[in-house]
């Protein structure tokens, strides 16, 4: 509701990636949606560097996904296979892997921890929290809010 009106198919559970693919009439690979802009701009690292973060890619064509996963690697992130487009809900806003600046192992675990149907409520709670802060949150504060939504200590 932050930007777009409701779309019936999405409200009924269709993944955004499948909906977009159907609308444009072409297959897609979903990637880079689960990292913040500052992460993309500032946190890419060489392969093997300590602290290298990960980004997930989901899609139905293994060949196309392999190309995108190479791009993720070239951008300075460890690529993680996020499954098919049907499974791409696991990297939507409000899921455990979304905008948390995780390394490869943490990203793989977070993708598996996603619970069907839970993300919209978590996403809305995160957005509500961030919109009611006294000042714009820093990159690190956004990461902490996203992580905290799933890992209460």
Region locations from a protein language model:
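Rossmann-fold NAD(P)-binding glycine/threonine-rich loop
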Residues: 1-47
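Active-site-lining helix/loop region of Rossmann-like oxidoreductase modules
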Residues: 50-153
